Amino acid sequence: MVNRNPKRSDEPVWWGLFGAGGTWFAMLTPVTILVLGILVPLGVIGPESMNYLRVAGFVTSIIGALFVIGSISMPMWHAMHRLHHGMHDLKFHTGTAGKIACYAAAALATVLSVVFIFMI
């Protein structure tokens, strides 16, 4: 028989954030590391393009703020989802408390990144 009142799961929400975070981490984080961690220190990109006023101007624009918030929060959602399911795979059955702790840490990182961006 078909269950007419199936129990709803919140897992699609977490899988969506997991997928978005993984995509962000795979596509945008390497480029960010290349530019900020390799090309600027080697002088390929001039230091005048990364002075405080230009970087602060970028971060305070809407696209820059969204980029910084995404760079902090999206990989965090990915990592916390992976940690939650990794604990389950390793037979650390923390139940709802572990789930809440993992996703609360990701939510806290997201909220703090938004707060700190608006403080600039």
UniProtKB/Swiss-Prot annotation:
InterPro entries hit by this protein: Fumarate_red_D, SQR/QFR_C/D
Any GO molecular function: succinate dehydrogenase activity
Protein's recorded name: Fumarate reductase subunit D
Subcellular location: Cell inner membrane
Subunit details: Part of an enzyme complex containing four subunits: a flavoprotein (FrdA), an iron-sulfur protein (FrdB), and two hydrophobic anchor proteins (FrdC and FrdD).
Lineage: Bacteria, Pseudomonadati, Pseudomonadota, Gammaproteobacteria, Vibrionales
Record's bilayer topology term: Multi-pass membrane protein
Keywords: Cell inner membrane, Cell membrane, Membrane, Transmembrane, Transmembrane helix
Role according to the record: Anchors the catalytic components of the fumarate reductase complex to the cell membrane, binds quinones.
Signal sequence residues: none
Cited Pfam families: Fumarate_red_D (PF02313)
GO biological process: fumarate metabolic process
Family: Belongs to the FrdD family.
One GO cellular component term noted in the UniProt record for this chain: fumarate reductase complex
Annotated TM spans: 25-45, 55-75, 100-120
